[in-house]
Amino acid sequence: MTVKAILSRKGSTVVTLDRSGMLSDAVKILDEHQIGAVVITGAEQQLVGILSERDIVHTIAQNARVFASACRLCDEPVEQFMTRKVETCTESSTVYEIMERMTVGKFRHLPVVERGRLVGIISVGDVVKHRLGEMESESNALREYILTA
């Protein structure tokens, strides 16, 4: 499947923010659209960058004192801001189940719980890496089959 095929299914709308936008604007956009990154544009919607949740966390970490003095929320317990209804999986969950749940739920991390105890966490990156490995193995097996047939 090509990127074009994926875009034809999901659409080509891209959430953007002008380079002069404020960090607070970006945070609002990420929240409103439930996305992990916003594309930053310049004149005539030209791509100039991308701002991700990780970029924001890195910025806060590098400027902790500035953020702490400017943001009274920084001294509040994380419990007040966390997601409380956490989707989880078990060690017996399949990769396909995980992919579907992550896609439908629009989240990138699934804690792995067995008998009420946290035993790990699976990220979308873990799933992608696994699928790429599977696809490579399948490709090699098919190639070998064709060569020996």
Model-derived regions, located:
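Short hydrophobic/aromatic-rich motifs at helix boundaries and adjacent loops
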Residues: 25-29, 67-72, 111-116
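Residue-level signal for alpha-helical context at structural boundaries
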Residues: 24, 44, 116, 145-149
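Short, flexible active-site loop motifs that bind/organize anionic cofactors or intermediates
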Residues: 13-16, 46-47, 88, 117
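Short, highly charged low-complexity linear segments
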Residues: 20, 116-117, 121, 140-145
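A glycine-centered beta-loop-beta connector
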Residues: 30-33, 38-55, 102, 110-125
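Tandem CBS (Bateman) regulatory domains
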Residues: 1-12, 52-88, 94-103, 124-149
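The conserved cystathionine-beta-synthase
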Residues: 16-35, 40-41, 88-106, 113
